[in-house]
Amino acid sequence: VRSERRLMEQVTYNMLFRWFIGLSMDAPVWDVTVFTKNRDRLLRGEVAGKFFAAVLADPRVKPLLSPEHFSVDGTLIESWASMKSFRPKDGSGAPPGPGRNGERDFHGEKRSNETHASKTDPDARLARKSNGQASKLSYAGHVVMENRHGLAVAATTTRATGTAERDAGKAMMAGLDRAPRSMLGADKDYDTRDFVAAMRGLGVTPHVAQHKNGRRSAIDGRTTRHPGYAVSQRIRKRIEEVFGWGKEIGGMRRTLLRGLERVGWGFTLRVAAYNLIRLPKLLAAPA
């Protein structure tokens, strides 16, 4: 089901949908605007963040969390806006073709976030995760994972910029409940002087992968020689399980929501859901 409007159409005539949500055959179906009103109410109450924090604060969960070993990473969340909506901010450019969703000729047009913006979702930014991949209108989702059991302990969403991962990493680690001396594993995108210095200023040892292609790494042998560095680099890859579940199962690959606040709300709920999926098995394991 691609949208909330289509969902309500299904509930209207699909007996399986009615059975699943407990509606009798002759019960009236609520209006689709109920979703929007309830979502706005949850946004105002910051329910997603509070729910995420409440799961981690549970007395049964807290002993599972490492207070000093963490990993950080980010992923792109494709916006619901299409590339057709990415138009010059000054209003120039060829007009779209006839029709509600008319075609536009982008041939020869240079497009960037400085000169263009989406008319459908102004908070979305043109971005790509790596060279060789197509650029898409996206948001950036970020997670900090504790390394003992691979549970997410911090999550946030930002506009997809070149420094978004490092900026979000600094903010999340600064607000994290952790031991005074901690370690943070990360990939080579975090290997910058600014990020490494910020982590050390927070009392966090940056176990970031070294970026050796054409520039000097911000960390040296004083960090990489320790056995803990290799362990952090091995375990940090588990954070991809959070993003993999969110995109394949949680519907996070392409958001149906618009605007940074709403997309962030949806991302945080999905990360909390990932923790909940993991917890029954972890709690049932012998101490």
Predicted regions and their residues:
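Polybasic low-complexity intrinsically disordered regions
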Residues: 9-12, 21-202, 274
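Helix-centered, glycine/charged polyanion-binding patches within enzymatic domains
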Residues: 91-99, 105-106, 188-268
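TerminUS-proximal long segments
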Residues: 263, 273-275, 280-283
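Structured core elements
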Residues: 71, 142-144, 152-156, 183-185, ...
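Short arginine-rich
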Residues: 18-22, 281
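A short, flexible helix-boundary coil/loop motif
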Residues: 249, 253, 280-287
